[in-house]
Amino acid sequence: MAKETFYITTPIYYPSGNLHIGHAYSTVAGDVIARYKRMQGYDVRYLTGTDEHGQKIQEKAQKAGKTEIEYLDEMIAGIKQLWAKLEISNDDFIRTTEERHKHVVEQVFERLLKQGDIYLGEYEGWYSVPDETYYTESQLVDPQYENGKIIGGKSPDSGHEVELVKEESYFFNISKYTDRLLEFYDQNPDFIQPPSRKNEMINNFIKPGLADLAVSRTSFNWGVHVPSNPKHVVYVWIDALVNYISALGYLSDDESLFNKYWPADIHLMAKEIVRFHSIIWPILLMALDLPLPKKVFAHGWILMKDGKMSKSKGNVVDPNILIDRYGLDATRYYLMRELPFGSDGVFTPEAFVERTNFDLANDLGNLVNRTISMVNKYFDGELPAYQGPLHELDEEMEAMALETVKSYTESMESLQFSVALSTVWKFISRTNKYIDETTPWVLAKDDSQKDMLGNVMAHLVENIRYAAVLLRPFLTHAPKEIFEQLNINNPQFMEFSSLEQYGVLNESIMVTGQPKPIFPRLDSEAEIAYIKESMQPPATKEEKEEIPSKPQIDIKDFDKVEIKAATIIDAEHVKKSDKLLKIQVDLDSEQRQIVSGIAKFYTPDDIIGKKVAVVTNLKPAKLMGQKSEGMILSAEKDGVLTLVSLPSAIPNGAVIK
């Protein structure tokens, strides 16, 4: 029997700059849905990609001295690298510069032109280049006036400046579909989510009257050209929106994917582009006589305490930095737990560190560690088989486990990720309390309570298994580590379907003898400071580095310092010191002993054989009773010392100038 299909898409991202945490938010959310649906047994297709045409890309490429495709290839490589780092499980990545996409855009445009839904006219309006969007005078924010006439303003979506544009343009006659669109909304009340977005679309855009949409430009060349009138480039919102069907092979020689997966189950996007997905896209599909997607979900923005993320404000969060320092699971967990999906949320370094320490390290990590340690201590690592509830606390835990799955499922189906995770953490917290209530350390002292003790352990492991399965869509590493440490190898016990009945571990298993912390605790103060520093714009960092920390010297002063190349031939720790190493270096004409404060960063074995730079004309000194005849140069950053290593080709004794 064929699996039920599920097709989910993210917005396709505009690669005019590096992506930030907000872009990762959309894509991680899509990944969570895709993993959840796969876990439920669906045949899932998850699409993401890039929107690569338009005036801004053309200008960026020219400024960089590259062709558009050269510029784009570099940007897309970075985006794909970030998605790989986030372990996004997309099934396809569509680029609007690909032939499979351009071919569909051309055919769609010509078809709409032929059937009269697109017509040629002249457009005059206010245009934002970064947003690639036209606005009417009434939509502008902070309009500027001269002699009572508007001469400028800003985009209501982004705040970017707009410019008055007048040019020949093709128009899409969307106004004639107004009644049909409203009828579709009535028949499909859950089409636009959250409901507040639907009210916004109707009251702000549809009721005032839909104006026909300009769908081509002649002022730039980078895009899909209209086949029957090549001086026109297809406007981005026709070009970009079609990606959802071009990626499935619509109008190609092989439409099997399109026939299998269309219509989409969910289009995910940030709230600023919901208008295009809930008004223009449905009308375009109506004009093509194609089924409409089942749901459009517009999530909120990730804001900072001082408003939207902006490089000039120094508040942009790079997901790469969070992943590299704190791990992927901590990053994904924070995004899905701290920020209510559908509403705006505020990113703070304090909340990120707290979620990692309290939720992941304390609640989940300690539960796993305590449980495995007790199984090892009381049963030599062999977990007794589940026997059923032997105590009213057992019955309570089993009932809560099944209720947790039910509540979790309801939240996941409505894309309330933070609520779903909160439900899991209530269960984890209750399981930690179950340990205190059953007092295994007391039961272990009474041989007659051996069965009761074993059943407590079985309930703890089963509860942890439940939590690990429910966390699989969110965390890509921790559930695997939990299953490994519990020695749960049967894939069946890792599936969502295994949660329908409590107590499937009806045979004894050997847990790991050495539980490993899954989430190390963070130094709150240090890590909050680190995240804040990483958010500063590059210019600020450069300015800090340019501030001289010591008085300037002239060349005569510098000439007094003698620096030579040397090879470290031996090293050992200085007794009674955790900072110092006693090092022997070969300077060709002589050997010297140098005492260096690098023991916290290097072992003796790490440095033997290294070619280093040595200041050879320092006055000899004694450190911890050891004579030191020089200084090995090292670099220091954020309290970390790194030896200055020289190429091996430089001979010992060579003077460095």
UniProtKB/Swiss-Prot annotation:
GO molecular function: ATP binding; methionine-tRNA ligase activity; tRNA binding
EC number: 6.1.1.10
Occurrences of domain tRNA-binding (ranges): 557-657
Motif ('HIGH' region) on chain: 13-23
Domain of life where this protein originates: Bacteria
Xref: Pfam families: Anticodon_1, tRNA-synt_1g, tRNA_bind
Main EC class the enzyme belongs to: ligase
GO BP field: methionyl-tRNA aminoacylation
Chain residues that bind ATP: 311
Job description of the protein: Is required not only for elongation of protein synthesis but also for the initiation of all mRNA translation through initiator tRNA(fMet) aminoacylation.
The protein's name in its UniProt record: Methionine--tRNA ligase
Source organism of the structure: Staphylococcus aureus (strain COL)
Organism phylogeny: Bacteria, Bacillati, Bacillota, Bacilli, Bacillales
Gene that produces this protein: metG
